Amino acid sequence: MDATFTAEQEEIRRTLRELLLKRCGPEEVRTAVQSEGGYDSALWETLAQQLGLPGLAFPEAYGGVGCSVTELALASEELGRSLAPSPLLATAVLSVPLLLAIGSEDQRAALLPRIASGELTAALAVPGASLTIALGLTGDNRGDWAGGGRAGGVQARRTDDGWRLYGQADQVLDGHSAGLLFVAAHTGGFARSRTLLFLLRSGSPGVTRVRLTSLDETRSQARVQLRDVEAELLGEEGESSDVAGVLASVGDSAAAVLAAEAVGAADRVLERTVEYVKQREQFGRAIGSFQAVKHRLADLYVQVQAARSAAYYAAWATAAGEERVGGLALAQALEALRITSSEAVQLHGGIGFTWEHEAHLYFKRAAGDELLFGPVHRLREHAADAARLFGGGEVAV
């Protein structure tokens, strides 16, 4: 592994950081999350058309940039520093890999250029509140999370006219505003139970999308209800796809990207805290000069740097084809963000507890991401189970 960033990677980080410093401060973030879409559409247009962010990690043949998960993780680290609300996670990290892995050539050719230009955003809808299970992050995703042949979840039924969907999906990131939905649905009953992926365009009859009130306002979520909705199968009819395996692979790469994003947020909130303790005075001296405060900040610094190393390795390893590395990096990064943001609230004193200060936004990001993709102990438990660390027998290599 070469830990040195290339000139192109450094340019991605530098350009994105400069843009976000100008256009995505705390007040801009608060304004953006109150908008109908939940993000700044003008900023998203700039990110798409000038920086090529939505198409960063897919081939140039479809209008993308042709980079890898590594570059996408580095870009997400910068977005995490400012908590920039955007459809990047839902579109480029969770949805595009599904289209690349399972979609037909016609579907890729029709949709990917529009995604790369920023014209089209996408979201992944899985039944109930099982996003972390569906992505294989905290458990085996070959279970009954998609419905399992019972009532509930999302059911797919084949008719003379095509496929029809019925059910409900919660925790759909950017589901209220996405122009394209990738829906995981159960079909086949008990005898031939399987999970398939379907495409739904914006405005499809029978689809109800409601934006939910979430703990982390910078990470918009929606509930999607489907009532006998006509849908298009992702991929070719008659072909058999390992949907669970593809979702687990997407979950692994998404975890690496999310780990980098969390590291960016933790690094920024630590920077702000260090700046503050140098200015705030007690007993005639800056509180940052007290040994106890120095020790706390030093511990936070070590934790953030360790999480950064894990996140960078996960991004590199995922791009190189390694599996089951993202979950552990995500666990370490989420823990670092939670501890750093909670310490930031305390070290900022009275102002850290106010709505006006941005410290609470970072704490909510940490808590919200653990609810969506964790919790940390289950991420680690699943990684240990996958490696057979405590089950006896030979340890998987």
Q: Which functions belong to the PLM regions below?
A:
Residues 1-80, 102-105, 114, 118, ...:
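Alpha-helical interface subdomain recognition
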Residues 86, 105-112, 121-123:
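Short secondary-structure capping/junction motifs at helix and strand boundaries
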Residues 86-106:
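N-terminal glycine-rich flavin-associated loop
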Residues 118-137:
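A short, Trp-centered hydrophobic/proline-enriched beta-strand micro-motif
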Residues 120, 150-152, 177-179, 193-194, ...:
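A generic structural signal for well-ordered coil/turn residues at beta-strand boundaries
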Residues 125, 168-207:
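A short core secondary-structure module
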Residues 136-142, 171-172, 201-236:
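Flexible, small-/acidic-enriched active-site or ligand-binding loops
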Residues 154-156:
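A structural signal for short hydrophobic beta-strand segments in well-ordered beta-sheet cores
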